[in-house]
Structures are given as structure tokens and as C-alpha cells.
């Protein structure tokens, strides 16, 4: 990344801002920019950077960053993600991230409410896996949730696949972002989203 070659913080910040604006399919530029801001003592600005990026591209990387940057307790954190989801242009994906936050913080009511807000056409395998996870957590002491869990797992097996890191050049997917595609060695084409070979599996909205 060119920003790594810049010794001055201001120059590095400028390049990271440019990189963030280049493609909303990338999380690294916003994460790096927020890290620089946090190191410079500008934590509020770092939080704003991540929140802005989250509203454009809801991603678990941003959940982790916000969890580290804020002093929120469990309820406050899930509430923060809920407010961001309501303001996001990718509402369904944002509420999926809110559900993940609710599950991670063990706030079941918030996780359930977030999952209910996701439209039927956006219910990918990740949605059903989270539904199964929620049912499994609730099953402790109440076996009535076992059937709900099992049904969600069956649905996950046949549901459309959600977004992944994938290369626009060759279509290969990976578990994590890379500057250069591991399959075709093309630079700067790996981003987050639904790959071309999966787009036709997701019902039109």
C-alpha cells in the first residue's frame, strides 16, 4: 500500500483517505486510517471513520474495530450498531452485523430483533446460521428451541451464499483480503461482495 511508504502522518492519512474512496469493497483503508487517528490521540475521529465506513460496507472487521475503540458496554455497543444499521444504505447487511453483535454480546433480544428486520430476499446462509446460533443459545434450559435450530441449519444448507472476499478479475474467492489475488496475481481487484458466479443465486430485490 502506497500509504506505508509515507513517513509523514499527514501524507499517509491523505493516501488512506484516497484509498478508502477508491472502492467501498475494501475495509483495509478505513481500518488503517482509523488506527493512525487513534495512535495520534484522535479516538473520536477514528470512531467516526469506522462508523462512516460501516454504513457504506457493513463488515465484521468494523465491528471488531469499534469494539476496540469505544468504551461501550454490551448494550451500548449493540445499540450503536443498531443506529448505524438504520442509517446505512445497506440495511439488510447492517442488521445482519447487528445480529452478530447481539450474539457476540449475548443480548438475545437485540439479535432476534435485528434478524427479523432482514428482508426475505436477503436471507443468505449467514442469516440462517445466525438464526441457528441464536436458537442454540436459547436452547440451554429450553429444548423447544432445538427444532428451530435444526430447521435453520437445513435452510442454511440450501440458501444463497452471502458476500465473500473475491477477485473481480478471475472470480476466485478467499477467506481474507489480499492486495494481490492469490489465484491470478492481479493487483487491487480483491474486494468484499457477492461474487459474479453467486449473484444469480440471490433473488432479485
Map each language-model feature to its residues.
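Repeat-based scaffolding regions
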Residues: 1-179, 183, 190-199, 204-205
Amino acid at each position: 500500500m502506497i500509504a506505508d511508504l509515507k513517513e509523514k502522518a499527514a501524507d499517509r492519512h491523505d493516501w488512506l483517505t484516497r484509498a478508502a474512496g477508491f472502492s467501498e469493497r475494501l475495509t483495509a483503508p478505513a481500518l488503517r486510517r482509523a488506527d493512525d487517528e487513534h495512535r495520534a490521540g484522535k479516538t473520536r475521529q477514528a470512531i467516526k471513520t469506522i462508523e462512516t465506513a460501516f454504513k457504506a460496507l457493513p463488515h465484521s472487521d468494523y465491528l471488531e474495530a469499534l469494539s476496540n475503540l469505544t468504551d461501550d458496554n454490551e448494550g451500548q455497543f449493540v445499540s450503536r450498531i443498531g443506529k448505524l444499521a438504520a442509517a446505512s444504505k445497506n440495511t439488510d447487511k447492517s442488521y445482519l452485523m447487528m445480529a452478530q453483535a447481539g450474539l457476540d454480546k449475548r443480548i438475545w433480544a437485540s439479535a432476534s430483533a435485528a434478524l427479523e428486520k432482514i428482508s426475505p430476499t436477503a436471507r443468505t446462509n449467514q442469516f440462517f446460521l445466525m438464526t441457528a446460533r441464536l436458537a442454540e443459545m436459547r436452547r440451554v434450559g429450553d429444548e423447544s428451541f432445538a427444532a428451530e435450530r435444526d430447521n435453520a441449519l437445513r435452510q442454511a444448507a440450501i440458501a444463497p451464499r452471502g458476500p465473500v472476499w473475491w477477485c473481480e478479475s478471475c472470480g476466485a474467492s478467499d477467506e481474507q483480503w489480499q492486495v494481490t489475488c492469490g489465484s491470478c496475481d492481479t493487483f487491487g481487484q480483491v474486494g468484499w461482495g457477492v461474487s459474479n458466479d453467486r449473484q444469480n443465486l440471490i433473488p432479485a430485490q
